[in-house]
Curated annotation (Swiss-Prot):
CDD domains: ABC_MJ0796_LolCDE_FtsE. Signal peptide: none annotated. Keywords: ATP-binding, Cell inner membrane, Cell membrane, Membrane, Nucleotide-binding, Translocase, Transport. Part of the ABC transporter complex LolCDE involved in the translocation of mature outer membrane-directed lipoproteins, from the inner membrane to the periplasmic chaperone, LolA. Responsible for the formation of the LolA-lipoprotein complex in an ATP-dependent manner. This is Lipoprotein-releasing system ATP-binding protein LolD 1. It is found in: Cell inner membrane. One of its GO terms (molecular function) is transmembrane transporter activity. Belongs to the ABC transporter superfamily. Lipoprotein translocase (TC 3.A.1.125) family.
């Protein structure tokens, strides 16, 4: 369960502070997905960073399964983040010198050497995203869609309660984007996680259970956008 209450964030400027988020509220149960759309500079990435505990709000709260991660010290919060939150970035953030399997196992390294269970789960996820035949390949040997599949598998390795995706199909052609969207939603549903996606793609947004637009720093619920391509 992800519960966001009255979240606000501003940044200092030469003049008045720049208010980016104003009283944001959001509640998602396990298995639910939400898209957040809005123009560049509207605060989408800031919101995602706060949900991922990579930035702190000025006021308001974030709770994941009843736990406030901002009540933890920096070390505890980092450990909590690694166990509870999965990230999918637009540019993948795959380490070029590591194989597909090694990249998927990166979250397990925070606990030391990956366990046999970690390795088994990585293999299962790599198979689930259709890359068993690429398990030993390096990122440079993969297509954009294949790299996105690796990122999805890595995000799910630790069985997180929440997955945060920043433009997961932003660099893909429409056909590949559709395939990746279907894969992501299938695995998210199977694992019963919360999925929050920041996107400019209205067709991707339409695939989510909930759709929100950031307007003047506040989240406004929207219906389907009706975009099919």
């Amino acid at each position: 369960m992800l519960v966001v209450s009255e979240l606000s964030k501003s940044y200092p400027t030469a003049g008045e502070p720049l208010s980016v988020l104003r009283g944001v509220n959001l509640e998602l149960s396990p298995g639910q997905s939400a898209a957040i759309v809005g123009p560049s500079g509207s605060g989408k990435t800031t919101l995602l960073q706060i949900l991922g505990t990579l930035d702190e709000p000025d006021s308001g709260s974030v709770q994941i399964n009843g736990q406030d991660p901002f009540a933890l010290d920096a070390r505890e919060r980092a450990a909590y983040r690694n166990q509870t939150i999965g990230f999918i970035f637009q540019d993948h953030h795959l380490l070029p010198q590591l194989s597909v399997t090694e990249n998927v196992l990166i979250p397990a390294l925070a606990n030391g050497k990956p366990t046999s269970d970690d390795v088994s789960r990585a293999a299962e996820l790599i198979d689930a995203v259709g890359l068993s035949h690429r398990a030993t390949h390096l990122p440079r040997e993969l297509s954009g869609g294949e790299r996105e599949r690796v990122a999805i598998a890595r995000a799910l390795l630790m069985q997180p309660s929440v997955v945060l995706a920043d433009e997961p199909t932003g660099n893909l052609d429409s056909k590949t984007a559709k395939t990746i969207t279907e894969l992501l939603l299938r695995l998210q549903a199977e694992q019963n996680t919360v999925l929050v996606t920041v996107t400019h793609s209205l067709s991707l947004a339409d695939e989510m259970n909930e759709r929100f637009e950031l307007v003047d720093g506040a989240l406004v619920r929207r219906g389907r956008f009706g975009i099919t391509a």
